[in-house]
Amino acid sequence: MESTIGIVLVFTAAVVTAVLAFFGSAIGMYLAGKAASGVLTERPELFSKMLILQALPGSQGIYGLVGAFLILNFSGILAGGDLSGITTNTGWLYLLAGLPIGLAGLFSGIYQGSVAASGVLMVAKDEANLGKAIVVAAMIETWAIFGVLISFILLVSIAG
């Protein structure tokens, strides 16, 4: 019973890590895409530039996916080995270790999408502003990367 609860918690950790980051990416891409759609009705030649700005918040979803794989890998579930060592306490540790990726992905994805939407308006006024719009939106990416780093350090300490 103890091992079963721990394994369920590890799977929950993987799901929560991924889904939170997926939500952040989806909402962020929605915000940027909504702004881009308005611009593209008037200036369809800006499609490739708008696509770049809309895609930026998608990276948080990738981080969430990687985080889920890391949790399943570090716990030994992907390898299919002996899982009897995954206690309830260990399961909780994996769940906590995934939260930095999930929460950083959720919030940074949403805020990056909001900034990217503003960047869409910058580019609509002057195409030369694309680089500036990308840099400003990419600054928010830093926090998602820090979330990945913290989760990785926690996972290494659990498995070690």
Task: Give the location of each predicted region.
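Hydrophobic, small-residue-rich transmembrane alpha-helices and their short perimembrane loops
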Residues: M1-G160
